[in-house]
Amino acid sequence: MKYLILAEKPSVARDIADALQINQKRNGYFENNQYIVTWALGHLVTNATPEQYDKNLKEWRLEDLPIIPKYMKTVVIGKTSKQFKTVKALILDNKVKDIIIATDAGREGELVARLILDKVGNKKPLRRLWISSVTKKAIQQSFKNLKDGRQYNDLYYAALARSEADWIVGINATRALTTKYDAQLSLGRVQTPTIQLVNTRQQEINQFKPQQYYTLSLTVKGFDFQLESNQRYTNKETLEQIVNNLKNVDGKIKSVATKHKKSYPQSLYNLTDLQQDMYRRYKIGPKETLNTLQSLYERHKVVTYPRTDSNYLTTDMVDTMKERIQATMATTYKDQARPLISKTFSSKMSIFNNQKVSDHHAIIPTEVRPVMSDLSNRELKLYDMIVERFLEALMPPHEYDAITVTLEVAGHTFVLKENVTTVLGFKSIRQGESITEMQQPFSEGDEVKISKTNIREHETTPPEYFNEGSLLKAMENPQNFIQLKDKKYAQTLKQTGGIGTVATRADIIDKLFNMNAIESRDGKIKVTSKGKQILELAPEELTSPLLTAQWEEKLLLIERGKYQAKTFINEMKGFTKDVVNGIKNSDRKYKHDNLTTTECPTCGKFMIKVKTKNGQMLVCQDPSCKTKKNVQRKTNARCPNCKKKLTLFGKGKEAVYRCVCGHSETQAHMDQRMKSKSSGKVSRKEMKKYMNKNEGLDNNPFKDALKNLNL
């Protein structure tokens, strides 16, 4: 008898097979005398579409809504049906005794496996492999601690409830809005509140009125003393009167106080923090960061599980620190890492906290030492950030003296504050940090002369527009960005992790860009006309982050066995009926403000121009037509004059590449330029691959052919 191991992806299945010495490669699985390991390809089974319940529902009609099946159906995904048949045969194989679920350790990973098992009709016992890294050592250790699969039943019920609720609400709200207003409009319990977040910030900026205020400082022996006051002076004359009082008056040092202080490193990275920092440092979007992180985790095996919301480690990981530090010796931080190898770490350190780790701990390096030359430029940047944060967390605190000098002049108090670094601690890892010395020349009781007075004018500034990094953080903590009627709602949002999950937020932002609900201009995310109209047309409940937080709260209760999934689904059905009725009875109108005179080549209706993340495209206004064509898009081809990225207009032989500097060239010229700078022939297919790549050519099968290009 054998154990069947079900992984989520082929790469993880290979890692498990390697760790357990399962060496016989079959068609769709690996095998030895004890184990069979196979894989899903993400989801192999999904919720049925409305037309799979009733073929008459293929056409979208408002009168057919709401669509609420009595029992939810699942179907095998067509493009991966071959692998499903392989997995099904293995599950039903009489040689298989138990099944070990080895999909991603989390709600969605559980759903991937259980939908397959339910579709097959599995009756065999289940075990659960729960891992946070796919290194050989981690896999072998986790196989010694397999859990009874029944312990994760509630996790599955929560995942299934989430999936079914999103289907019921999303399908009906989207079809209702689209058919009511004859436009491609989409609603969702996560995406719509996210549009509202962006819109709220945009309104705050538009309504902001700057105010002028003034500050006063004195210069004494080259040091600037600030007027000590909690008041913001909006009347310049008040400060001018103080300056007049100070003329020909000496000051007296009232006190010189020194307080020794410590500062501590930032928390270890969770996914959201890492995505935010990658955007802040390198302008790399959340989706791209997650994809790169997934590569570091699955392919290179140098970091732990990416989709985590925790900033902490569990206490049983203390003894693994030395191996992880040794792995970082391959990086530019080796000089800072070396002293830490001999250090003894304690579970009492602040980074270790079992109560603050749920499914997965913070993102840190594994014990696998990377081959730095194998990492792409983006992978290097990301890995370096993780290593930097990890090493900082293990280093001593930064220590400094906070010096406060108080000056009294004509009854007014002025203050000088300076920090003097005494111990670099974790800041030694940062370039430019050093021990500082302040030779402040003041002693208590000194009489001093004022060499200069300075009245400075300031202006209040509006909040900043969200960018892709800060929007992620806002989705995680929406209570900090919206007004709520009751403080308990803010607590609900905080406890449930806000809008979406750490694993889905990047996809949601990407989806909103693609559906033209939001756009980014110079890194500033704004709501489009379409996005604003969606908010106006959508039921108010669906625009609030509070609703999704309340749902998430119930899903967490289901996960803990404290709420019935059936009750939750019934609530969602009732909510959906109200949403559909509200849309049906609405007298509002939707206006296409981006309608063009270009006819759709498929149905003849006029097309609408929409902005995408990387350019513009024309989309048929008829939701059932789905015809699209690119108008322009950014490429990775470089201008030969200014080296900026070129924008592609048109397609095929008529395509033209243009640059902001004024340079332009035809497709034929671009092909010729590539060939002249390459050692070999470059096909149109290869050219297209090059244009579509988000990163360099490191992992491109045409790397050798294109390595001499200077585009």
Swiss-Prot record:
Domain called Topo IA-type catalytic: residue spans: 152-580
Catalytic activity: ATP-independent breakage of single-stranded DNA, followed by passage and rejoining
One MF annotation (Gene Ontology) recorded for this entry: magnesium ion binding
Active site: Y305 (o-(5'-phospho-dna)-tyrosine intermediate)
GO biological process per UniProt: DNA recombination; DNA repair; DNA topological change
Region ranges (Disordered): 691-711
Site entry (Interaction with DNA), positions: W60, W167, R175, R307
SMART domains assigned to the protein according to its UniProt record, in alphabetical order: TOP1Ac, TOP1Bc, TOPRIM
Chain spans, region Interaction with DNA: 186-191
Family to which this protein belongs: Belongs to the type IA topoisomerase family.
Purpose: Releases the supercoiling and torsional tension of DNA, which is introduced during the DNA replication and transcription, by transiently cleaving and rejoining one strand of the DNA duplex. Introduces a single-strand break via transesterification at a target site in duplex DNA. The scissile phosphodiester is attacked by the catalytic tyrosine of the enzyme, resulting in the formation of a DNA-(5'-phosphotyrosyl)-enzyme intermediate and the expulsion of a 3'-OH DNA strand. The free DNA strand then undergoes passage around the unbroken strand, thus removing DNA supercoils.
Protein name: Putative DNA topoisomerase 3
Originating gene: topB
